[in-house]
Amino acid sequence: MEQQRTKFKTPADSRTEWMKVIQYEDINGSGRLFGGRLMEWMDEVAGIAATRHCNDYVTTAAVDNLQFKNGAFINDMVVIVAIPTYVGRTSMEVRVDVYIESRENGTRRVINRAYFTEVCVSKEGCPKPVEYGLELVTENDRIEWYGAQKRIEVRKHRRNEGF
């Protein structure tokens, strides 16, 4: 967990939650939410969480472990929650969970999860250092940090293989 920074934010400081009711323009011919539409929303919320962490511009570099676990349908209330899990020199990993929230009792069921790699960039689009480190407060924060380190190694391995 080496971070050569003097300023830190906790994952909770940058946590972002966004909600939307699924409309007709969001569904495909099978009556389900378009996967691409959901990916677009997830990317936007991940970018907002990363921006909140670094207080700067970001761009998406990679998406890992995108898993569609359950469908979503017209009039479902979609909740997207993004939270930073790791901060490197110029990049951050953001976990994005997607839920459907019950109108009756507010319970949430997971429909999707993914990890986004966001790169801090200048106005010109060049990578630049992230000013804030990530202060790991909870046990879950530490578990996510170590999981991110493993995902980084997998990404490096895949990149070396030409993927």
Feature-to-residue mapping (PLM):
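A short small-residue
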Residues: 21-27
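A conserved, well-ordered hydrophobic junction motif at loop->secondary-structure transitions
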Residues: 27-39
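Short histidine-centered beta-strand/loop micro-motifs
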Residues: 29-32, 51, 70-71, 108
